[in-house]
């Protein structure tokens, strides 16, 4: 669990996301409150619940990105889902409890990676012994092994082909038990059941000495780890630090005077209620309590309003944050200031072909102007519009780059307008192309 202060969290998010101060502050406080709760003792720690967040704002302004970066920063298990993917229990489709099962799977992967790091040194030594076994055989004398070990460490044997035995963790058939709630809790993994009884399956792989190390280190790490301990730790991490991001929540809000699929929509909201409030979800690894999982929901709310959500669900999302639409200045800053801005990405991509790209200030202004105009006249898709515009502007250079090694292209406003100006003015055409 990271112990960044809210100010540090906001400045970290500023590296990747432009503007949206209110949303950044809300998620920073929510993350810091988790750390504060961890410092409490006993009963009070159980009583403190996370304050779930509802983000309201048009598409492409940074709702998803804020949550994704936040989870990375926290090193917490994070799962992003679309509310529209789920159906009411009893209907065909996924039920909302699957969200928590996915969260546990992600937590197990996270914990396993962390634990592998702890035993990496020991696993590396064991892997080296196995490479030596493959090179000189298990019965070789200590002198022979030592001489080969020196060659191995000097990199002299890197290209030599060897055969290694590794545990076979290939996909085994899954069987589902009919009538189980969620239809996934009853998944029986045959290799899980029979693996221990059969002593674990292995398979032979042919590879070079250099490439065998990562495979063998993973294999040896898993032998040194206690799988039950990993599962217990993952369940704890899911419960205490898990973050669930539910996008498109506005699409399951019953619209005023609407009809049709309203029942199923409302059903999904009702199924979400206990999850957000706090319930126990059965997973194949054990029960998971959702009381302290942080839920961040978001929606554009073009057609419906936040007040169209069920009152009970509104009450469980106490923190409301409105994200503003992007301005011309925001587009300029997105192109130039973010850590891996689109311009930096294209310059780096072209450098692989030994082609140099240079963008003038007026080109950046022109790109921002075109993106703002298109969002206003065609459809507002936020910052994603820049990708479409940039791709169109650099289409010719991208296509001919392999033949132009050593060349330098200066992109200025005139070049941008030449490539895209006419299309942007013709609204009917730009609807289809941009």
From Swiss-Prot:
Main location: cytoplasm
Top-level taxon of the source organism: Bacteria
Cystine crosslinks: none
Keyword line: ATP-binding, Chaperone, Cytoplasm, Nucleotide-binding
UniProt GO cellular component terms: HslUV protease complex
Biological process according to GO: protein unfolding; proteolysis involved in protein catabolic process
Positions annotated to bind ATP: 18, 60-65, 247, 312, 384
The keyword Nucleotide-binding is assigned to this record: yes
GO molecular function: ATP binding; ATP hydrolysis activity; peptidase activity; proteasome-activating activity
Protein localization: Cytoplasm
Pfam families: AAA (PF00004), AAA_2 (PF07724)
Role: ATPase subunit of a proteasome-like degradation complex; this subunit has chaperone activity. The binding of ATP and its subsequent hydrolysis by HslU are essential for unfolding of protein substrates subsequently hydrolyzed by HslV. HslU recognizes the N-terminal part of its protein substrates and unfolds these before they are guided to HslV for hydrolysis.
Subunit note: A double ring-shaped homohexamer of HslV is capped on each side by a ring-shaped HslU homohexamer. The assembly of the HslU/HslV complex is dependent on binding of ATP.
Family the entry assigns: Belongs to the ClpX chaperone family. HslU subfamily.
Name of the protein this chain belongs to: ATP-dependent protease ATPase subunit HslU
Origin species: Brucella melitensis biotype 1 (strain ATCC 23456 / CCUG 17765 / NCTC 10094 / 16M)
């Amino acid at each position: 669990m990271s112990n960044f202060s809210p100010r540090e969290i906001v400045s970290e998010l500023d590296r990747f996301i432009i503007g949206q101060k209110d949303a950044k502050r809300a998620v920073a406080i929510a993350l810091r409150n988790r750390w504060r709760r961890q410092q409490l003792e006993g009963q009070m720690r159980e009583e403190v619940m996370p304050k779930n967040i509802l983000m309201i704002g048009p598409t492409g302004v940074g709702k998803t990105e804020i949550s994704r970066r936040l989870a990375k920063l926290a090193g917490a298990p994070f799962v992003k889902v679309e509310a529209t993917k789920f159906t009411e229990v009893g209907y065909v489709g996924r039920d909302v409890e699957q969200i928590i099962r996915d969260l546990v799977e992600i937590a197990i992967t996270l914990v396993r990676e962390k634990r592998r790091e702890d035993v990496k040194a020991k696993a590396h030594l064991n892997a080296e012994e196995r490479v030596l076994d493959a090179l000189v055989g298990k019965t070789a004398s200590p002198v022979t092994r030592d001489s080969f070990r020196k060659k191995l460490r000097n990199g002299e044997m890197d290209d030599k082909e060897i055969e290694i035995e590794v545990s076979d963790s290939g996909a085994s058939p899954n069987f589902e038990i009919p009538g189980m709630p969620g239809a996934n809790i009853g998944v029986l993994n045959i290799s899980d059941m029979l693996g221990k009884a059969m002593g674990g399956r292995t398979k032979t792989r042919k590879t070079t000495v250099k490439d065998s190390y990562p495979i063998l280190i993973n294999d040896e790490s898993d032998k040194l780890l206690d799988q039950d301990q990993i599962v217990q730790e993952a369940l704890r991490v899911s419960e205490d630090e898990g973050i669930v991001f539910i996008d498109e929540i506005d699409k399951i809000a019953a619209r005023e005077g609407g009809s049709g699929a309203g029942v199923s929509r409302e059903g999904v909201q009702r199924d979400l209620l206990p999850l957000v409030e706090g319930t126990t979800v059965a997973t194949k690894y054990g029960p998971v309590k959702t009381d302290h999982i942080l839920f961040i929901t978001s929606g554009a709310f073009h057609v419906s309003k936040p007040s169209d959500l069920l009152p009970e669900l509104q009450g469980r999302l106490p923190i409301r944050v409105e994200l503003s639409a992007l301005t011309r200045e925001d587009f300029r800053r997105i192109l130039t200031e973010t850590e891996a801005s689109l311009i930096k990405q294209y310059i780096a991509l072209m450098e692989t072909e030994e082609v140099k790209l240079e963008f003038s200030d007026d080109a950046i202004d022109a790109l921002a102007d075109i993106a703002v105009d298109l969002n206003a006249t065609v459809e507002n898709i936020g910052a994603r519009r820049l990708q479409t515009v940039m791709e169109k502007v650099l289409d010719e250079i991208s296509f001919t780059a392999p033949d132009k090694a050593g060349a330098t292209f200066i992109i200025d406003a005139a070049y941008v307008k030449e490539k895209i100006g006419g299309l942007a003015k013709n609204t009917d055409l730009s609807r289809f192309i941009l």
